Amino acid sequence: MQITILGSGVIGVTTAYYLAKLGHEVTVIDREEGPALETSFANAGQVSPGYASPWAAPGIPLKAAKWLFQKHAPLILRLTTDPVQYRWLLQMLANCTDSRYKINKTRMVRVAEYSRDCLIELRKDTGIEYDQRSQGTLQLFREQYQLDGIGKDIEVLRQDGVPFEVLDRDGCVNVEPALAHAKDKFVGGLRLPNDETGDCFKFTNALAKIAEGLGVKFRFGVNIKSLLMSGGKISGVETSEGIVTAERYVVALGSYTPALIKALGLNAPIYPVKGYSITAPIVDESRAPVSTVLDESYKIAITRLGDRIRVGGMAEVSGFTDDLPAARRATLDLSVTDLFPGGDLKAATFWSGLRPMTPDSTPIIGGTRYDNLFINAGHGTLGWTMACGSGRLLADLISGNKADIRADDLGIARYN
């Protein structure tokens, strides 16, 4: 089939790759001049299936209220006049119950674990390189109450068969030796040994080249205006370079997905939650991380990417903004300097991206009420973690193949 994919972030490119592997003629359209130049550009770099947890969780409303008054808060709420923002926040609050948390986390872990397996297989098949490491993720707790409160997460990890280790200070230093100088800064950690790290931008660009070798065509610098309808199905895509037609269409536009499909009567409650990162060259190996360390207090991930340290995190609900406030940079600097001062922060680059978040934190993967329109969006902070599995899953659904994992609860129908 002829298939057009809208969006060349990591989700769009992985979808294109898997569709091409199944023999389809694929075209990818994006307004940028190359792949992964928006939200996929400089994320935290972690592939962490076990840490696939909903932002909407029991106790979060109270925590959020406290965070609003903290200088280095992991959550920043900047209210706008947009009613969509208020509606999304209310939907998120409705998911902050024990029952919804368990349902949403199980869905997320299912996709994330499958995706990690798909990534490993893809790596074996292609030999793709992207500063990859397979040395686990360490969630670091600065306070005892944080360590004492991981019971629910451990219960879900056990249920889903995800290996984990609860570590004391010495155990944390054993897996991340650079923490030896900061033993007074934390009390323990939770380690998931099967997690990975890697540069999402490098991966997406390398996979795009592999996909081109499979026949995928990329059209960059093309603005997407609207989806056209005829006879109850999508008949084309109106772009800045004319109308593009295909047999099937995939919308993988992250936070911009709702605006495109709204005219079709489809509701995708995806809202941009802004994240920040800095990337610094390593100047002292003895003070640099081995893999990814999650600073639980600040909700910040510190990741080793080759000869660089990537520090990413925070969640700012402020709409479609692209500013880079010095206060956000200060929080990133504080966390990494406290734990891993092996990077040259004076030479660091500062970046922000708009994570496409659903109120239940679960991505939208699947078809719509229009037979030839599909969506792969809303992965939030886990686009890199879930990319390969999401792309392969949707490729199977479009092709009419039996999916490897359950997919009936991942579609847009749960909102419409």
Swiss-Prot record:
EC number(s) per entry: 1.4.99.-
Q: Which residues bind FAD?
A: 3-17
Is Transcription one of the keywords?
no
The UniProt catalytic activity note for this protein reads: a D-alpha-amino acid + A + H2O = a 2-oxocarboxylate + AH2 + NH4(+)
Taxonomically, which superkingdom?
Bacteria
Q: Does the keyword RNA-binding apply?
A: no
Name the pathway it acts in.
Amino-acid degradation; D-alanine degradation; NH(3) and pyruvate from D-alanine: step 1/1
Gene Ontology cellular component list: cytoplasm; plasma membrane
Keywords of the record, alphabetical order, are: FAD, Flavoprotein, Oxidoreductase
GO biological process, any: D-alanine catabolic process
EC main group: oxidoreductase
Q: Which GO terms describe its molecular function?
A: D-amino-acid dehydrogenase activity
Tell me which InterPro entries the record gives.
DadA, FAD-dep_OxRdtase, FAD/NAD-bd_sf
Q: Which cofactor does it need?
A: FAD
Q: Which Pfam families match?
A: DAO (PF01266)
Its family remark reads: Belongs to the DadA oxidoreductase family.
Role of this protein: Oxidative deamination of D-amino acids.
Q: What is this protein called?
A: D-amino acid dehydrogenase
**The species this protein was found in:** Brucella abortus (strain 2308)
Its taxonomic placement starts with: Bacteria, Pseudomonadati, Pseudomonadota, Alphaproteobacteria, Hyphomicrobiales
State the gene name recorded for this protein: dadA
